[in-house]
Amino acid sequence: MAAPSGDGSCEDFTEFQEILRVMRTIDDRIVHELNTTVPTVSFAGKIDAGQTCKQLYQSLQDAHASRDKAIKRCIAQTSTAVNNLQAERLKDSDNLALIKLLRKEQSKLKFLKSELNVEEVVNDRSLKVFNERCRLHYKPPKTE
């Protein structure tokens, strides 16, 4: 399942959300993927469930890391922009266009930070479903 690299622009939050939505396809389809690739008991001998689960786990981890990196990159870029705009506002506190732009960037930063929470929920859900179906076939390495 090829997904965008997450190198899209952080300028347009709506565009960035769309990129994340596409990147979350693997998580959205985890149940279908498990149902079509991990064998039931009656077909257990025909497919190497351990290898299948291992590959799916690696795909999930790669997707999660890619999205996390993209979100954090945009948070860093937007934080820098907010800091720069705040410094400019100190020099020119009457500039309404500057104040409006600062508020826009602050809102975008808040939305980007909320995407980290969304990402945590999506990741937890996917790993829960994965573990329910693959726990007998593959034990992922411990993280953290």
Swiss-Prot record:
Spell out the coiled coil positions from the record: 82-120
Instruction: Fetch the InterPro entries from UniProt.
Output: MIX23
Keyword vocabulary terms for this entry: Coiled coil
A family per Pfam: MIX23
One Gene Ontology term, aspect cellular component: mitochondrial intermembrane space
Q: Where are the transmembrane segments?
A: none
Q: Which domain of life is it from?
A: Eukaryota
Tell whether Methyltransferase is among the UniProt keywords. Answer: no
Per the similarity annotation, which family is this? Belongs to the MIX23 family.
* Protein name in the entry: Protein MIX23
Lineage from the top down? Eukaryota, Metazoa, Chordata, Craniata, Vertebrata
* Chain's gene name: mix23
